[in-house]
Every structure is written in structure tokens, then in C-alpha cells.
Curated annotation (Swiss-Prot):
Listed name of the protein: Protein-export protein SecB
Pfam families on file: SecB
The organism's taxonomic lineage, starting at the top: Bacteria, Pseudomonadati, Pseudomonadota, Alphaproteobacteria, Rickettsiales
GO MF annotations, alphabetized: unfolded protein binding
A GO cellular component annotation in the UniProt record: cytoplasm
GO aspect biological process, one term: protein folding
Major place of residence: cytoplasm
Task of the protein: One of the proteins required for the normal export of preproteins out of the cell cytoplasm. It is a molecular chaperone that binds to a subset of precursor proteins, maintaining them in a translocation-competent state. It also specifically binds to its receptor SecA.
Keyword Chaperone appears in the UniProt entry: yes
NCBIfam families: PRK05751.1-3, secB
Length: 164
């Protein structure tokens, strides 16, 4: 008789929901910023990841809070704030792997949506669409962990400024 072992459950990441939690676009001086700017603005981008364990079993909310400011000659041209989140269910995943998945893989899943919202918001604000560069979350988390001696649950803030 052949002994059959119970098949090991495979690790699984399920995206249960994605949504905009907060969105703000400020254009403080549209006449001057849309018609009188002659040089390329300086773009500053800050990104923060917030991870919250939800009451449901193995469910987590991962938020990307993004702030983008454009300035020219020390005058603010526009400012965008986007908080975009996803609900993720992690099944059969070790605690060590959860930290990596929640701080790297989940943000990688929702970041393209943040990028699209920023692009569309700047375009609808009268500017050229602003395409935020790809972010290597694994590299940033690695650098953050080295600097912070690995916190219990990673809550990094990144300055991912691109000079445009």
C-alpha cells in the first residue's frame, strides 16, 4: 500500500480590493503656472508605505501615500497628494516572508495605479502628464532596513525625487 501525504498548501497572495482613500490636486496660481513658466519645474516626490493588519484573518491593508510637488523659481506650480490602498489576503506565508511581501510585493502591485492617477491629475490640471519613474521597492526597503536596523513592521518613508 502506498502512503499518501496530504498536499502542502501553496502560498497565496490575493488582492481583495483596491481603492483611492484620498486625492488632492492643488494649482495655486494657474494663470502664471500654465502660461508664464519658461523653464522646467523641479519635481519632488515623497512616498510612504503604511501597513495595517485587519481584523479578518490574514488580511492586510497596504497604503501608498504619495506627495508630488512641482516648483519653479521657489514658487509652487502644483501639488498632488494621493493615498491609494489595497486589501491583501496572505495565506500559507511565513511571518518573515509576510514582511517582504507587504512592504515590497504589495506596493509593486498598486504602484502603477498611483502612477496613473498622478499622470491623469496633472494632465487634467492643465499640465503635461507627469510620469513618475518606476520605484524599486525591494532596494529601498533593503536600504531602509539597513539604516533602521530592521523595525518590527516596516513603515518607511521614501524620498524618490526626480529632477525634471
Amino acid at each position: 500500500m502506498v502512503a499518501t501525504s496530504k498536499p502542502k498548501s501553496e502560498p497565496k497572495i490575493a488582492v481583495k480590493a483596491q481603492y483611492v482613500k484620498d486625492l488632492s490636486f492643488e494649482n495655486p496660481d494657474p494663470i502664471n503656472s500654465l502660461f508664464k513658466i519658461t523653464e522646467k519645474p523641479k519635481i519632488d516626490t515623497k512616498l510612504d508605505i503604511n501597513i495595517t493588519k485587519l481584523s479578518e484573518d490574514n488580511h492586510f491593508e497596504v497604503e501608498l501615500s504619495t506627495n508630488v510637488s512641482a516648483t519653479c523659481n521657489d514658487k509652487k506650480i502644483f501639488h498632488i497628494e494621493v493615498v491609494y490602498a489595497g486589501i491583501f489576503q496572505l495565506t500559507n506565508i511565513s511571518e518573515e516572508d509576510k514582511k517582504f511581501i507587504l512592504s515590497v510585493r504589495c506596493p509593486e502591485i498598486i504602484f502603477p495605479y498611483v502612477r496613473q492617477i498622478i499622470s491623469e491629475s496633472t494632465q487634467k490640471g492643465g499640465f503635461l502628464p507627469l510620469m513618475i519613474d518606476y520605484i524599486d521597492f525591494a532596494e529601498i526597503i533593503s536600504n531602509t532596513q539597513t539604516t533602521n536596523n530592521q523595525q518590527e513592521l516596516i513603515k518607511p518613508e521614501f524620498d524618490v525625487s526626480n529632477k525634471q
